[in-house]
Amino acid sequence: MSDERRLGEAIGAYLRSAGHEEVALLGEIARCWEDVVGPKVAEHASPVGFRGHDLVVAVDHPGWATQLGFLAATILGGLEAELGRAVAQGLEITVRR
C-alpha cells in the first residue's frame, strides 16, 4: 500500500471519528473516481459533495451531464464494488459555470 493511500485512509478515519462522515466518504470516492469512471470521464466530471442521499457530480459541459445521467447506475455500482458499500441512492449532476 502506498504512503499516499495510507495517509488518505488515516485522514478518513480521523474525519469519521470527528463526525465528518460525508467529508470522509467524499475523499474515498475521489480517490477511486478515475478507476470507477475511467480517465476520459474523470477529465470532465468530478464528485463534489452530497445533497440528501445523492452524490453530487460536477461536469464541465452539458453533454457530459447527459452522458453521466445514462451511466448513473453503472457509476454507483462501481463505487459500491470499489468501496464495499453503497455510497448514494442517485447522482445529482451539475454543470460547472
Model regions: which residues?
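N-terminal presequence-like segments and adjacent domain-start helices
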Residues: M1-E34, E43-G49, T66, A73, ...
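Short, aliphatic-rich beta-strand segments
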Residues: H53-D60
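A short local structural element in Rossmann-fold oxidoreductases
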Residues: G69, E80
